[in-house]
Amino acid sequence: MAQEQTQRAGGGEDDETTGGDGSAGQERREKLAAETDDLLDEIDDVLEENAEDFVRAYVQKGGQ
């Protein structure tokens, strides 16, 4: 069981060091960064329009 616990999940850097295509990894990182930025922008828009409703709903769901 101890051997199973030593295995890591993920490891984005390992892809490049094992001979993977570095440019493909870079493109994927850029795409994920752009998607993350888009999602954060969408969240900002919702908060700007309905901050009070958002906070009220969050607190009702058990947030602090």
Curated annotation (Swiss-Prot):
Domain of life: Bacteria
Residue positions where Deamidated glutamine is found in the record: 64
Coiled-coil spans in chain: 24-52
Keywords: Coiled coil, Isopeptide bond, Ubl conjugation pathway
Post-translational events: Is modified by deamidation of its C-terminal glutamine to glutamate by the deamidase Dop, a prerequisite to the subsequent pupylation process.
GO biological process assignments: modification-dependent protein catabolic process; proteasomal protein catabolic process; protein pupylation
Signal peptide: none
Annotated stretches, region: ARC ATPase binding: 21-58
Cross-link (Isoglutamyl lysine isopeptide (Gln-Lys) (interchain with K-? in acceptor proteins)): 64
Pathway, per record: Protein degradation; proteasomal Pup-dependent pathway
Region (Disordered): 1-37
GO MF term set: proteasome binding; protein tag activity
Comment field on protein domains: The N-terminal unstructured half of Pup provides a signal required to initiate unfolding and degradation by the proteasome but is not needed for pupylation, while the C-terminal helical half of Pup interacts with ARC to target proteins to the proteasome.
HAMAP family noted in UniProt: Pup
UniProt family annotation: Belongs to the prokaryotic ubiquitin-like protein family.
Described function: Protein modifier that is covalently attached to lysine residues of substrate proteins, thereby targeting them for proteasomal degradation. The tagging system is termed pupylation.
Complexes and interactors: Strongly interacts with the proteasome-associated ATPase ARC through a hydrophobic interface; the interacting region of Pup lies in its C-terminal half. There is one Pup binding site per ARC hexamer ring.
Name of the protein in question: Prokaryotic ubiquitin-like protein Pup
Source species of the chain: Rhodococcus erythropolis (strain PR4 / NBRC 100887)
